[in-house]
Amino acid sequence: MATHNIVVFGGDHCGPEVVLEAIKVLKAIETNSPSAGKFNLQNHLLGGASIDKHNDPLTDEALNAAKAADAVLLGAIGGPEWGTSSTVRPEQGLLKLRKELGTYGNLRPCNFASESLVDSSPLKAEVCRGTDFIVVRELTGGIYFGDRTEDDGSGYACDTEPYSRAEIVRIARLAGFLALAKNPPAKVWSLDKANVLATSRLWRKTVTDVISKEFPQLQLEHQLIDSAAMLLVKNPRALNGVVITSNLFGDIISDEASVIPGSIGLLPSASLGGIPDGKGKCNGIYEPIHGSAPDISGKGIVNPVGTILSVAMMLRYSLNLPKEADAVEAAVKAAIDNGTKTKDLGGNATTSDMGNAVVAELEKILKA
């Protein structure tokens, strides 16, 4: 029987609350799906909690555990008490973790966990119904990692966006793999600014080469990022499939997409350091897209669904347990369809109520 080693970072404020519900889901799988194996959970501090105890947002011990693990589950980090004026900040720990694990691809799905949530979207139901795409953002290159010149009082500053062909090739391969894994295979949308930027022209050429040569059965379409941003509001279904883009553009477009399903508390994410083809280790960092929410933490009202669905992504991509991943997603849908909703969705369920409802549905599915 397989043992899956998972490092758990509860993080700060609401982070430990939502992670607790996600762990309930893993325990339910362990009990009701023996073939899935055992989950060896190792708890460590990250972010502000680690700063408070160790004056370090990510200790060597925690980092080494994460490197050795099969996957990392994270709640949320940060808070006003560790502000931007501090020399040691929670975000430094997460950036170091991503760098050391080599997680070059960030995945953010944009879909509705339940059809009943369509009316929660800021977009009209007839516009957003059926939206189902995943943004694959290049995470370790581009303008965030380029040379920069700070304003020294002269009134001039500069940021540069470097990209190499190798960096683009590996993210294009990840997008191609994810698109091909869909049934039927999904369309690939590549977003750039090739009419202006040299890096975008290299991006477009490289993505075209990779998809046409390595994934010839896939349909690829290029879209300028500004046009895609408009399309995302006007007709988000048009982008259904796999959306691949650079670090900066992905940061912006994935945040724009996150409002479509109605609550950021619903949305998961994965940051992967390889291709999840089951042929080798594919470590990843799995976390909800929301922040640590210090204003509502400790009140039992935070929505844990984004973290629970992050567990589903972990099961699918790092632990090679697709049946259990599907079961978790189906359980979330059933729980919401049956009326269990947290405050952000217009309900009155507590954080633990939501987690318990998902677990109850999951047990039914796994026992069927």
Curated annotation (Swiss-Prot):
Keywords noted in UniProt: Amino-acid biosynthesis, Branched-chain amino acid biosynthesis, Cytoplasm, Leucine biosynthesis, Magnesium, Manganese, Metal-binding, NAD, Oxidoreductase
Enzyme kind, highest EC tier: oxidoreductase
Positions that bind NAD(+): 79-91, 291-303
UniProt-annotated site: Important for catalysis, residues: 144, 193
A GO BP entry: L-leucine biosynthetic process
Cofactor(s) the record lists: Mg(2+); Mn(2+)
Gene Ontology molecular function: any one: NAD binding
Positions annotated to bind Mg(2+): 226, 251, 255
Function, in words: Catalyzes the oxidation of 3-carboxy-2-hydroxy-4-methylpentanoate (3-isopropylmalate) to 3-carboxy-4-methyl-2-oxopentanoate. The product decarboxylates to 4-methyl-2 oxopentanoate.
Identification of the protein by name: 3-isopropylmalate dehydrogenase
Organism field: Neurospora crassa (strain ATCC 24698 / 74-OR23-1A / CBS 708.71 / DSM 1257 / FGSC 987)
Lineage of source species: Eukaryota, Fungi, Dikarya, Ascomycota, Pezizomycotina
Gene: leu-1
